[in-house]
Amino acid sequence: MNTNDEKIQWHPAFDAALQIEFGDEAKYLEFDPEHLISKKPMQIDVLVKNEKHVKLRKNIGRIFRQYNIIEYKSPEDDLDIDDFYKTYAYACLYKSETETVDLIPADELTITFVCYHYPRNMLRKLEQDRKFSVEQQDSGIYYLVGDAIPIQLVIVPKLSKEHNYWLNNLRNDLKAGSEIKNFIESYSKNKNSKLYQALADAVMRANWEK
């Protein structure tokens, strides 16, 4: 467990890991962390715009449309039913807080929840109250089916180490020795990138005692 007095900046590290994950496809996307959705103090963790309507191959981006709202929970936080409705409300506010009517089409919105613990209680509530169903699309990636807005759930520790290496390593429970050593070696090849630096800083501090 990390005992560093200074709070680890998980959200900037997640934003960096997210951009890294998309690799060459990131150039088609606009990433806007902590996007303010109105003049009031409400903000989306990350807003990803696909203005060019590129069909993404990356597994976490296949669900994406033009405007993609992402809610991220750090390793210490759980995703609950109130988080679901808050983020859903943010998506609706983002669609409506525009200068002209229907500037952002509802069918161009998606919602992604990224967390570390499978939210059983939240999903059970959605299944009971909203008749949602959960469909696994890939390792750690689930679609919540039953709403007009496409919704996906990403469980960081369950992501593929092959296809989502950097996001999968954004954790505070890397195994001492092998996983940490491999992370350092992989990072050393990209250490001049500010994105990789932000990610590595959080990961190394979170796993410092190991």
Positions of PLM-derived features:
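Elongated, amphipathic alpha-helical interaction scaffolds
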Residues: 1-210
